[in-house]
């Protein structure tokens, strides 16, 4: 009957999975190596841009109807290279952790700082001076991520790309990803990332998603 068909159509919409593709921004200049670079607004290096273009040429990045990015230059530039025809939606909460006065410093430079010792020892509520604690950082990105998922479900947007920072992606996958793993198990190089599948029932019940592939993907034979 017509009523039955409408009911099944509504159920199909409710049950439709959402896909989010996380991509870590390309590489920044090697002079920043081993430094805490969070909200410092450094651009991609020329080498980083070339590496992204090469990845884009040799491999396959997923398509989507929505593109979200951190406000920081290195993420926006990554969007311009990988998705030149899409207009990204800038979300401030997708920014990397704010390391405050520790920005631009190495662990070696900070090793005698008592606050730093507590922070590096895993104390989630310890804040760098004028920065944010790891607990604050986690709360910020979790609220943002859940808002994005809710928005995708409400608008029927099945595919989205999030271009952000390694710390953001690793933390979100450790909290919401299956198989369960620690943040550093999800570490990735610049230009790489992971795709997750969000099934509405599983999300509403347990707030979890399935990490099902690394990206970019190898090109299939004959693909340009």
Indicate where each model-derived feature is located:
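Active-site-proximal alpha-helix that buttresses catalytic centers in soluble enzyme cores
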Residues: 23-86
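N-terminal amphipathic/basic-hydrophobic helices that include classical n-h-c signal peptides
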Residues: 1-14
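Conserved histidine-centered catalytic loops in small-molecule metabolism enzymes
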Residues: 16, 62-93, 174, 197-224
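Domain-level recognition of soluble alpha/beta enzyme cores
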Residues: 179-207
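Glycine-rich phosphate-binding loop signature in dinucleotide/nucleotide-binding domains
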Residues: 60-63, 148-158
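Generic beta-sheet signal
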Residues: 20, 156-166
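Phosphate-handling substructures
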Residues: 82-142
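Short beta-strand scaffold positions
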Residues: 69-70, 139, 163-164
């Amino acid at each position: 009957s017509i009523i039955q068909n409408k009911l099944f159509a509504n159920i199909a919409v409710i049950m439709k999975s959402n896909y989010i593709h996380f991509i870590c921004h390309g590489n920044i200049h090697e002079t920043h190596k081993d430094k805490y670079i969070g909200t410092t607004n450094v651009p991609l290096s020329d080498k980083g841009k070339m590496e992204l273009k090469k990845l884009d040429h040799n491999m396959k990045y997923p398509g989507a109807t929505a593109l979200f990015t951190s406000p920081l230059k290195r993420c926006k530039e990554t969007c311009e290279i990988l998705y030149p025809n899409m207009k990204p939606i800038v979300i401030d909460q997708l920014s990397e952790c704010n390391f405050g006065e520790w920005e631009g410093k190495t662990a070696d430079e900070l090793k005698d700082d008592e606050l730093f010792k507590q922070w590096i020892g895993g104390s989630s509520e310890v804040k760098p001076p004028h920065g944010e604690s790891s607990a604050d950082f986690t709360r910020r990105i979790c609220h943002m991520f859940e808002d994005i998922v809710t928005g995708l479900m409400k608008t029927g947007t099945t595919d989205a790309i999030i271009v952000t920072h390694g710390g953001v992606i690793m933390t979100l996958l450790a909290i919401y990803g299956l198989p369960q793993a620690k943040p550093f198990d999800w570490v990735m190089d610049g230009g790489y990332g992971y795709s997750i599948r969000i099934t509405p029932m599983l999300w509403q019940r347990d707030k979890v998603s399935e990490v099902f592939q690394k990206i970019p993907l190898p090109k299939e034979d004959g693909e340009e």
